[in-house]
Amino acid sequence: MRILLTNDDGVEAAGIEALVRVLSPRHTVVVAAPAFEQSGMSHAITVKRCIRLDRYRPLEENYGVTAYRIEGTPADCVKLYLEAISADIYPEYVISGINHGANLGTDVLYSGTANAAMEAYLHGITATAVSLDMKSEISYDTAATLLEENLTSLFYEEGKVNFYNVNFPRQFCEGGPQFVFTQLGRRDYINAFQKMEDEDGRECYFLGGEILDEGNSEATDIVAAERGYISVTPLQTDLTDYIYLEKLLR
């Protein structure tokens, strides 16, 4: 299968290298990933300046893949590759990740990882965003292997375009790794901004905070991850509130 890999942690990240290591022996792999970390970039794209890129030799020399290091956002990387670099030989499948840290619930709206996958989906290509809990006991290689083993049975369906958000937990539940289909939960934060001063004495704020997960049902990705399951959430790009729209049109 022709697979495009991207992420928001940057082309040098361990998570994307694990995917290359596991996938390249059996698939035709191309990497198009940011030159630098781009966490929290959501679906931002670069305008009013050139996007520079070069080849990333370490991945090419170690694994025999084609790899691009792109000075842009995660969405830039996918958009640029598909529209300008690919020579109309599109990948059959796009994987964004493996992200260092979970992308659960409403955090997907801010996630560069998830939105890079969404960019592929907008181009009519099945895409999966993959994340691993920051404190996970599970290795990137294990996550990549489980993904590859379930590629055609769980994620890729010929003739149909799907968009999934996948999260690996801190540790697997009793009985070993299990994939479960979920819906997005709601993730909030306590004291999200920390007030500070910069080197010039000016007031500034650092985004952080403690996670606050309340009121999420058993059907959500957040609860599934807490219980040690690998959550698989199908996503879409249509944000229309059809129930309310129907009322407005009456």
Model regions: which residues?
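Electrostatically charged, flexible surface regions
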Residues: T142-R250
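Glycine-rich phosphate/pyrophosphate-binding loops
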Residues: Y121-A143
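Short beta-strand segments
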Residues: T6, A32-P34, E71, S96-N99, ...
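Short, glycine-rich nucleotide/cofactor-binding loops
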Residues: L5-E12, D107-V108
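Glycine/threonine-rich flexible loop motifs
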Residues: A102-S111
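Hydrophobic/aromatic ligand-binding patch that stacks against planar heteroaromatic rings
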Residues: A116-A120
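Conserved acidic residues
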Residues: E92-Y93
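A cross-family phosphate/adenosyl-ligand binding-site feature
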Residues: R2-I3, A14, L19-A84, D88
